[in-house]
């Protein structure tokens, strides 16, 4: 795995592939960032953005955001091994001052410190609790006016976002479906 663009382009990312984590493939990540850069329907700026990387695993999405100029990325994950790799990556890439590691379940975090521009959610494909987490994030109003939600799901998933999200776009890459949305 590697950083695809920005100031750290080409740098290698350590990763961990277990049953509990499945890193976002480089090709899928590259397509997400191409859409962020070139889509007419998505108008969120990555430069100086506050990004919340939820179910972050080793944090490949958030690391990419930091390489491309994001101001701050909290990474939320509960898997100890994934967090160890993430911490190592942040130190090796010398971007740890722009990151916060939160070892907790999203539903246990009752108060967030900031409002965010970009939310990235990559929950386990079988986990449906993430929809309740989305509702809670929406209710806490921790999103800026200019925001975007990006969700990585299995391509055949049938998630119900009614009343929570306005879907802007969906793209399928192999087994993955990427959803671009806004809070309603």
Task: Please tell me what each predicted stretch does.
Residues 1-184:
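Class I S-adenosyl-L-methionine-dependent methyltransferase catalytic core
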């Amino acid at each position: 795995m590697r950083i695809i663009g920005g100031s750290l382009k080409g740098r290698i990312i350590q990763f961990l592939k277990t049953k509990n984590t499945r890193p976002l493939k480089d090709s899928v990540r590259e397509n997400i960032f191409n859409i962020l850069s070139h889509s007419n329907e998505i108008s969120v700026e990555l430069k100086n953005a506050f990004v919340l990387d939820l179910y972050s695993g080793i944090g490949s999405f958030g690391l990419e955001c930091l390489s491309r100029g994001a101001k701050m990325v909290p990474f939320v994950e509960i898997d100890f091994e994934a967090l160890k790799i993430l911490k190592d990556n942040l130190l090796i890439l010398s971007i740890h001052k722009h990151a916060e590691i939160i070892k907790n379940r999203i539903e246990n975090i009752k108060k967030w410190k900031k409002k965010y521009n970009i939310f990235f959610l990559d929950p386990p494909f079988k986990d449906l609790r993430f929809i309740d987490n989305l509702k809670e994030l929406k209710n806490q109003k921790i999103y800026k006016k200019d925001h975007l939600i990006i969700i990585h799901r299995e391509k055949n998933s049938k998630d119900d976002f009614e009343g929570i999200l306005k879907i802007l776009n969906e793209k399928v890459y192999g087994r993955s479906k990427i959803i671009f949305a806004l809070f309603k």
